[in-house]
């Protein structure tokens, strides 16, 4: 395993993390991880991230049930970004869409809504 000390966390101790569907390759979300989130992810096999707005560790799907089972972690060539190859339960986006990338640049909805946030949160 790569020594986590060799990863390039930013000045706030964070590293960018992309969640990607293990089967289809679809990009589902972008978030940040601190070292603790990465360690918890490795330890449990369930994606954990760092919430910049709440300033706390969060287990993806903890309140919604829409967890991310991690199959593989990939580190980029600069050691400053991570891809999590995951199986997504339910939707990845808190707005109800399967992917957080559900709009194109024109503002058109191009993604699939898979749950109603009012029923979950």
Swiss-Prot record:
Pathway: Amino-acid biosynthesis; L-histidine biosynthesis; L-histidine from 5-phospho-alpha-D-ribose 1-diphosphate: step 3/9. GO terms for cellular component: cytoplasm. Keywords: Amino-acid biosynthesis, Cytoplasm, Histidine biosynthesis, Hydrolase, Magnesium, Metal-binding, Zinc. Signal peptide: none annotated. Binds 1 Mg(2+) ion per subunit. Its main location: cytoplasm. InterPro entries: PRA-CH, PRib_AMP_CycHydrolase_dom, PRib_AMP_CycHydrolase_sf. Zn(2+) binds at residues 77, 93, 100. GO terms for molecular function: magnesium ion binding; phosphoribosyl-AMP cyclohydrolase activity; zinc ion binding. One of its GO terms (biological process) is L-histidine biosynthetic process. It holds the Pfam family PRA-CH. The keyword Metal-binding applies. Its cofactor is Mg(2+); Zn(2+). Belongs to the PRA-CH family. Homodimer. This is Phosphoribosyl-AMP cyclohydrolase. It comes from Methanococcoides burtonii (strain DSM 6242 / NBRC 107633 / OCM 468 / ACE-M). The lineage of its organism: Archaea, Methanobacteriati, Methanobacteriota, Stenosarchaea group, Methanomicrobia. The gene is hisI.
